[in-house]
Amino acid sequence: MKFYWSQIYSWLLRTPYRSLERAYRASKKIQHIKKNYIFYNKNIISSSRRSWQAIMLYINTNLNNCVFIIYWSLLEYRISLFFFDFIKTFVLIISNFFNSFFSNLISNNVIKQDLKEIKQMNKKLAWIEASLNDLDMWKYYYSFSFFSKEKQKTVETSLTFVDLKKNNVTTAAYESIGLVPRSITRTLSGFKTELTGQSTSLVLQDFQIARYQALASLQYMLFLLFIPWGFSSLLKIWFLEPWLKNWWNTYQYQIFLNSFQEELALKRLQQIEELVWLDKIMVNSLKEPQSQDLNIEIHQKTIQLVKIYNENSLNTLLHLLTDIVYVITLSAVFILGKQRLAILNSWIQELFYSLSDTMKAFSILLLTDLCIGFHSPHGWEIVIGSFLEHLGFAHNKHIISCFVSTFPVILDTVFKYWIFRHLNRISPSIVATYHTMNE
């Protein structure tokens, strides 16, 4: 046990050195990214727009992550250093009153050992400061040079290397739709690459871009799935459930949330009374059942039923609060991850457009039939009914029928507009295959 506590104590003492080492490694990574950028710089202008924007977004994201790690580690370093300096000063003051030998031991051994580490820490701090200053100058120089080069070609394809949030620049990691089909531009770009002898470097670039898009998209999808669910579940267990139980059982005297629950409880109570009478009659068929015993048993069953519906009302409120937290967390992930969302959008579009025309039409037909097919109203009724029961509302047939009769029609209109407006310009063959399979 003593060895375990000594390990924890030594780990805490090494916190300033560990955080500074993390910041130092991040500054080294910045230098490595800058060296790789020189390789991208040779072919970035001659590459396609998709490759160019994805490379710039990839490098800018990595640099921002490294800078965030550096500043966060330096903050941890300063806080931990201030805390341990305060402890050392306090120990030295106490040792002067109690034991002069303890004071000499600290001043002679510990401080001498700290001097060597302080020199190394100062060197690392100087390196980190120089790396950050050099990064600012480097960003300014390359953003200005690339903006001046691309401004002569087109304004739409200009992508500076400054912070995207400060300049409100929205980028996409895929090629936008233009007057000239993308297949023609890609063919001309590939032909130009073969003539200039840059195919090997561009293949490596495309592979790195594809790997980055896939990893970033999968990571963002995992974030969308697990972060809202995990945060809402932890908040439900640690805060919402204890607080809501205390408030509901202390300050709230109402058991039912709405009339729907009261009707269900009344029907259930009538069934319980009938079952109790039936059991007594079947057991004591020769004797007349006593009304006092029946009233006591019915009273006990009623108390159990009240506890059950009180717990159901509490769970309904708890589910509602948890769903609100889930929606807020999911919205925050969408807002804070706009760049990752653009990468995910480009990755999904690349996967979709890489399919054959038959598979594209099959995917569209499958999605439309699931949402707005002839059998979809029954599925929508089940979904809406389950959602209303989850929120504790009554199963209203009029509301469900109104929703089922209008919402699939809106979805059908949106699908048709998307096919006519967007898909027909990108690939008319997909639209022709879709209509053929649909007929």
UniProtKB/Swiss-Prot annotation:
It is a multi-pass membrane protein. GO terms for molecular function: antiporter activity; proton transmembrane transporter activity. One of its GO terms (biological process) is potassium ion transport. It comes from the Eukaryota. InterPro entries: CemA. It catalyses: K(+)(in) + H(+)(out) = K(+)(out) + H(+)(in). Keywords: Antiport, Chloroplast, Hydrogen ion transport, Ion transport, Membrane, Plastid, Plastid inner membrane, Potassium, Potassium transport, Transmembrane, Transmembrane helix, Transport. It is found in: Plastid, Chloroplast inner membrane. GO terms for cellular component: chloroplast inner membrane. The chain crosses the membrane at residues 55-75, 79-99, 220-240, 317-337, 364-384, 399-419. Contributes to K(+)/H(+) antiport activity by supporting proton efflux to control proton extrusion and homeostasis in chloroplasts in a light-dependent manner to modulate photosynthesis. Prevents excessive induction of non-photochemical quenching (NPQ) under continuous-light conditions. Indirectly promotes efficient inorganic carbon uptake into chloroplasts. Belongs to the CemA family. This is Potassium/proton antiporter CemA.
